[in-house]
Each structure stands twice: as C-alpha cells, then as structure tokens.
Design a protein with these regions (language model features):
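Acidic-enriched and Gly/Ser
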Residues: 2-130, 146-147, 152-155, 159-177
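Short coil-to-beta-strand transition motifs
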Residues: 133-142
Length: 178
C-alpha cells in the first residue's frame, strides 16, 4: 500500500473530449500540480490557417506527481479525472517509481521527435540489440535499439513497464553495443 505522506507519480485518466477547452493536464497545472502528459505534434486548421500544436499522444493518459491526499478531493470533485487502478487489488492506484518516471521524462525532453509505443505495439522484430549511450544528453542510458522498417534513424527504447514506451532518436556516435 502507498504511504499517504509521500509525493508519488500516479497514473491517471482524463475522460474529457479530445477537443475540450480545459483538459485535465492543463487544469492540474493551473493548480500548481506537477503533470506529465506524453505529447506529439499535430497539424490542425484554425480560422483557415494551418497551425502546428502539441496534443496528448494517448488522449486519456496522464502522470501526476503529488500527494494522494491532495489528489483525492480533486478526483471526487471532477468525475472526468480518475485514477487508473491496479488489477486484482482493492482501491490501489497505479503508480510509477520516481526514478523510472524521471528517466522517461528526461528521455522524452531530450528528443525533438519522440515516437511513442503502447506495450502491444512493440514486436520482437523491432527490438535489435542492447545498447548503452556514451555522451550526449542521454549519457548513461541503457536499453534496446529499436529498428523501424524503412527508417535510417536509430532509436533507444525507454519504457514505463506495462504503460508506455518511447523511442528517442540517438546519434550513432553515442551508441555502444553491450
């Protein structure tokens, strides 16, 4: 069970429409709560002009870093913001360790064009070799080299187990095979 006095990364859901004016990640940021939502670039049209903006890559997924006692009243007050619950456990929300989450956020922010994968999208054919990054913004990271058919870009796979994975571009000069 989670101790109530420690800030933790909670996995949460936002059930609002995709075009909502104030999605949960913006609402929680306004409340000065630390939120991470995996984002992607999207080209849309507003008033006849094409506009490039960032939108969540998985619409209902967000990671919130705070105390459970701070989040519980918000979840009770706003029915579209919910915890994701662990299966076969009674009222225990999903969490991600601080170390894993910080590693994931750092990897995503180091790449201009991260490519997100759901666990079921990763096939054994995509996973090549174990690598370590030596130098650059991702220095010290270890993981799997991801190959996508037809792409010359080298990507390191950084995972949040059972939730999400991201392939971040890596300069070949920083790659060391393990």
């Amino acid at each position: 069970m989670i101790t109530e006095k420690k800030a933790t990364w909670f996995v949460m859901r936002d059930l609002k429409r995709a075009n909502a004016k104030l999605p949960a990640y913006k609402f929680l940021q306004e409340k000065n709560i630390r939120v991470f939502t995996p984002m992607r670039w999207y080209l849309s049209e507003e008033k006849g002009k094409k506009v490039r903006k960032q939108v969540p890559c998985v619409r209902d997924l967000l990671f919130v870093y705070d105390y459970r006692e701070t989040l519980d009243p918000i979840v009770e007050l706003i029915p579209t913001i919910q915890y994701r619950w662990l299966r076969n456990r009674y009222r225990e929300p999903m969490t991600v360790s601080d170390v894993e989450m910080e590693r994931f956020i750092r990897a995503v922010s180091a790449s201009e064009s991260p490519k997100y994968f759901l666990p079921e999208e990763i096939t054994p054919d995509m996973l090549n070799r174990k690598i370590r990054i030596v130098g650059g913004p991702l220095d010290g990271y270890e993981g799997t080299l991801v190959s996508t058919r037809g792409s010359k870009v080298k990507r390191l796979l950084v995972e949040l187990p059972d939730l999400l994975a991201v392939g971040v571009e890596v300069n070949p000069e920083y790659i060391q095979l393990i």
